[in-house]
């Protein structure tokens, strides 16, 4: 009976491990993150132009300028994962 339970657990673990392999292809590699170009923005005001970006902190920012404002205020290091909402 114990062998059967262990065999079922091992089979279930192997199946879940396969699903991890298939989802790895959907993950974004760190080398693909884009560094925001914060030098091109005039502070302390950003335009209201909506062009969402997804930061590496998994927050969506209204545009690259608002992400740069967050970096400037907090001193945090946030890159851009993609040019659309998270």
From Swiss-Prot:
Name of the encoding gene: Spink2
Pfam family, one: Kazal_1
PROSITE patterns (alphabetical): KAZAL_1 (PS00282), KAZAL_2 (PS51465)
Disulfide bonds, paired cysteine numbers: 38-68, 46-65, 54-86
Places the protein is found: Secreted; Cytoplasmic vesicle, Secretory vesicle, Acrosome
Task of the protein: As a strong inhibitor of acrosin, it is required for normal spermiogenesis. It probably hinders premature activation of proacrosin and other proteases, thus preventing the cascade of events leading to spermiogenesis defects. May be involved in the regulation of serine protease-dependent germ cell apoptosis. It also inhibits trypsin.
Annotated positions for site Reactive bond: 48-49
Taxonomic lineage: Eukaryota, Metazoa, Chordata, Craniata, Vertebrata
GO MF term list: serine-type endopeptidase inhibitor activity
SMART domains in alphabetical order: KAZAL
Keyword hit for Transferase: no
Protein's organism: Rattus norvegicus
Positions of the Kazal-like domain: 32-86
Keywords: Cytoplasmic vesicle, Disulfide bond, Protease inhibitor, Secreted, Serine protease inhibitor, Signal
Official protein name in the record: Serine protease inhibitor Kazal-type 2
Record Gene3D superfamilies: 3.30.60.30
Cellular component, GO annotation: acrosomal vesicle; cytoplasm; extracellular region; neuron projection
């Amino acid at each position: 009976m114990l062998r059967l339970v262990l065999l079922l657990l091992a089979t279930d673990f192997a199946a879940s491990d396969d699903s991890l392999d298939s989802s790895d292809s959907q993950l974004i590699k760190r080398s693909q993150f884009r560094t925001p170009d914060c030098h091109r923005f005039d502070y302390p005001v950003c335009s209201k132009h909506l062009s969402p970006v997804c930061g590496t902190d998994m927050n969506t920012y209204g545009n690259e300028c608002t992400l740069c404002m967050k970096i400037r205020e907090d001193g945090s290091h946030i890159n851009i994962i993609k040019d659309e909402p998270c």
